[in-house]
UniProtKB/Swiss-Prot annotation:
The gene is NAC102. Induction: By low-oxygen stress. Residues 146-208 bind DNA. Disruption phenotype: No visible changes in phenotype. This is NAC domain-containing protein 102. The lineage of its organism: Eukaryota, Viridiplantae, Streptophyta, Embryophyta, Tracheophyta.
Length: 312
């Protein structure tokens, strides 16, 4: 048997005429009314003691009219099924344990803070990620608009490169409320007194996104192991005893190489090797090709002037 549980004039309203159910409702009304007068509302799920078959499944208009409007007006809410938390301090998969009621969707009252002290945009950072709005805002209430419904998706990681998750939030706020910076007193970051949030996972799972999995590797990872290169492109590449990472090739300075080459030719000349008629023409031909590669294309002058053959 499916029942609907929501707050209106009485605490419970169900579409059923069974006298035992009616008596149960009256009993619960008396208990909760007494607790309301004593200020001892239940704080945990188990204290609700709802019978099997009851479901908290209010419409958008019921959420705004019977819950959000009353909370913002500091009026009592007879059925304590919506917890009051700072929702933006937590990841969405942490919220179900903080809810007072719910199996596949959970409801919360929360404040919103400004993103900037002098602005009216809300700060959407939450836990290890952030909430991102999707779609258009939906007005709630007819003929007069009472509230605004906004849909948001949770992204794990840092904006704007977070990983999209399956966690969804429907945020309900009151309409026609001045949230401009001109009403901001004493540089207060508080944007709203209260908003009402419905949280659920569209796949019906309790999937979690850890920070390590949310951040994509974008920087080179350095290692101090002498067997590895000083720059390893992929973080998946590690050092082991069975294989090594090839180090980067070392470039030889051209001036040092030429200086060493001149020293060698001077040594050859001193011992008479360059006086060999058979060696000199062949070496002049090879050196001529080598010098041509260093020609300046604009001045057509060689960068280097080598004369290996003896002057006659």
């Amino acid at each position: 048997m499916d029942f609907a549980l929501f707050s209106s004039i009485s605490i419970f309203e169900i579409n059923h005429k069974d006298p035992p159910i009616r008596r149960f409702i009256k009993t619960q009304n008396r208990i909760l009314s007494t607790r309301k007068q004593q200020g001892t509302f239940p704080k945990m799920k188990a204290e609700l003691n709802l019978p099997a078959g009851f479901r908290f499944h209010p419409t958008d208009e019921e959420l705004v009219k019977f819950y959000l409007c009353r909370r913002c007006a500091s009026e009592p809410i007879n059925v304590p099924v919506i917890a009051e938390i700072d929702l933006y301090k937590f990841n969405p998969w942490e919220l179900p344990e903080m809810a007072l009621y719910g199996e596949k969707e959970w409801y919360f009252f929360s404040h919103r803070d400004r993103k900037y002290p002098n602005g009216s945009r809300p700060n959407r950072a939450a836990g290890t990620g952030y909430w991102k709005a999707t779609g258009a805002d939906k007005p709630i209430g007819k003929p007069k608009t009472l509230g605004i419904k906004k849909a948001l998706v949770f992204y794990a990681g840092k904006a704007p490169k977070g990983i999209k998750t399956n966690w969804i939030m429907h945020e309900y706020r009151l309409a026609n409320v001045d949230r401009s910076a001109s009403t901001n007193k004493k540089n207060n970051l508080r944007l709203d007194d209260w908003v009402l949030c419905r949280i659920y996972n569209k796949k019906g799972t309790m999937e979690k996104y850890l920070p390590a999995a949310a951040e994509k590797p974008t920087e080179k990872m350095s290692t101090s192991d002498s067997r590895c290169s000083s720059h390893v492109i992929s973080p998946d590449v590690t050092c082991s005893d069975n294989w090594e990472v090839e180090s980067e090739p070392k470039w030889i300075n051209l001036e040092d190489a030429l200086e060493a080459f001149n020293d060698d030719t001077s040594m050859f000349s001193s011992i008479g090797l360059l006086q060999n008629d058979a060696f000199v023409p062949q070496f002049q031909y090879q050196s001529s090709d080598f010098v041509d590669s260093f020609q300046d294309p604009f001045e057509q002058k060689p960068f280097l002037n080598w004369n290996f053959a003896p002057q006659g």
